[in-house]
């Protein structure tokens, strides 16, 4: 775009001189940085929160800061990390009135834990007396609410004996209390930083499982008239595109993404389980929107699921990152597909479930790709395998002496290679490749590699 021309001072010297002389320097005040304290004050002054909430949250904030000063080492770092995360949300303008309860509950629980409770292992889950909520330890970010873990627990109560009804009720009410408005609907958000995604974010896996568990609980506890409107509000996330919601339109229907901050990453196990959740919500409540959202996702999943079958194992994700499942996620995907197969009797899901079950007892297929190398230099020894496995390579000389032994570790499917400093002595060497897949199925091959004499170096002239 061409720069706009303006009259120069030379052409209107008198006017410019007058204006420059008359104009006093203007000092612009820097815009105040958004902090927890300022955002609380703003919400209170604008009538978004009442006096009791304002006073209680200010007290929690002050207690956390005071406790941080009294702690040392890992305890101090964890509590400070939680506070920094909430401060970051405040700085980004995300500290809405509707989020204050779950966020200040997070601050309060972390202050309680790190003041007196044991240090934790990464991923360890804990609870507090008088509450059914599940908290998960995230190194550097302290204890965090974990929606999926909580909804898994709620599902267990809802499907279990009526002796669990009291605990089912407590957890259900606690989970409803931490739900927040999002995109015109209702969501259970994550407040931790994960894979570069800053909070707050949502997940189709957690949301779908959550609505399933709430619908089951509502039916079991005879609370459907009360909870159906909330369930319907929760469906809104499946109608909204990221980063607000989880819906990504495809040629076949709609894919529901696992992470709202990363819509190009397609994780199949989360998508499949979100469909199981939507299917159950539609069946339990009779809600037509839930049925339509399932149908939209079902059309996409029927096209997508076969693409995650490598012929020997399952893929965990595609598009932004394509990689194979580890054993846990392979089995989890198989189980989710079993659920979808049982509900829909759809050939695509039932076939994939059968394949993934079979792969758990099928050893990897190996093939030696390198058959000839020149001696006297470092060369590449290539081999291929059919599925992610722990592999090792051993080469023996014609004399029987081992000349290479490499533990390659866990490697993915496809063609792989190891570096080999090839001996100068020509002859037929033997390569042995051993591989054990993640389910413990072993395989091995042996094959010859011909080592050629090194090329003679040309003598320099004269």
What is the predicted role of each segment?
Residues 80-87, 101, 143-159, 201-219, ...:
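Well-ordered alpha-helical segments within folded domains of soluble proteins
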Residues 377-381:
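Structural beta-strand segments of beta-rich domains
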Residues 402-427:
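Glycine-centered tight-turn motifs at strand-turn-strand junctions
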């Amino acid at each position: 775009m061409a720069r706009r021309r303006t009259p120069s001072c030379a052409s209107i010297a008198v006017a410019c001189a007058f204006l420059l002389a008359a104009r006093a320097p203007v000092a612009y005040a820097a815009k105040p940085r958004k902090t927890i304290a300022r955002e609380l004050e703003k919400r209170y002054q604008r009538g978004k929160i009442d006096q009791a909430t304002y006073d209680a949250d200010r007290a929690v904030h002050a207690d956390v800061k005071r406790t941080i000063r009294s702690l040392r080492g890992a305890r101090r770092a964890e509590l400070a990390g939680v506070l920094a995360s909430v401060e970051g949300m405040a700085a980004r303008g995300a500290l809405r009135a509707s989020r204050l309860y779950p966020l200040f509950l997070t601050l309060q629980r972390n202050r309680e834990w790190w003041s007196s409770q044991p240090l934790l292992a990464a991923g360890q889950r804990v609870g507090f007396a008088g509450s059914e909520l599940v908290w998960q330890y995230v190194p550097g970010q302290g204890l965090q609410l974990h929606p999926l873990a909580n909804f898994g627990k709620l599902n267990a109560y809802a499907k279990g004996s009526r002796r669990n009804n009291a605990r089912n009720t407590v957890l259900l009410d606690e989970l409803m209390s931490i739900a927040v408005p999002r995109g015109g609907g209702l969501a259970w958000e994550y407040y931790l930083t994960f894979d570069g995604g800053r909070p707050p974010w949502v997940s189709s896996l957690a949301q779908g499982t959550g609505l399933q568990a709430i619908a089951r609980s509502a039916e079991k506890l005879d609370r459907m008239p009360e909870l159906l409107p909330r369930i319907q509000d929760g469906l809104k996330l499946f109608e909204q595109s990221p980063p607000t919601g989880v819906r990504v339109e495809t040629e076949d229907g709609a894919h529901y993404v696992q992470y709202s901050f990363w819509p190009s990453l397609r994780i199949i196990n989360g998508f499949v389980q979100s469909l199981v959740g939507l299917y159950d919500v539609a069946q339990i409540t009779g809600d037509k929107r839930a049925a339509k959202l399932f149908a939209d996702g079902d059309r996409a999943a029927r096209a997508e699921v076969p693409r995650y079958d490598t012929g020997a194992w399952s893929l965990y994700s595609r598009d932004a990152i394509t990689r194979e499942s580890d054993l846990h996620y392979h089995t989890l995907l198989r189980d989710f597909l079993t659920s979808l197969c049982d509900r829909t009797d759809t050939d695509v899901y039932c076939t994939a479930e059968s394949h993934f079950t079979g792969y758990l007892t099928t050893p990897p297929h190996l093939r030696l790709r390198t058959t000839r190398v020149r001696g006297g230099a470092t060369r590449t020894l290539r081999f291929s395998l059919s599925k992610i496995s722990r592999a090792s390579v051993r080469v023996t000389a014609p004399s029987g002496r081992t000349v290479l032994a490499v533990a390659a570790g866990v490697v993915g499917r496809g063609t792989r290679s190891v570096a080999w400093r090839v001996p100068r002595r020509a002859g037929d060497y033997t390569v042995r490749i051993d591989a054990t897949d993640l389910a413990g199925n072993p395989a091995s091959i042996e094959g010859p590699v011909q080592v050629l004499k090194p090329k003679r170096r040309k003598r320099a002239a004269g």
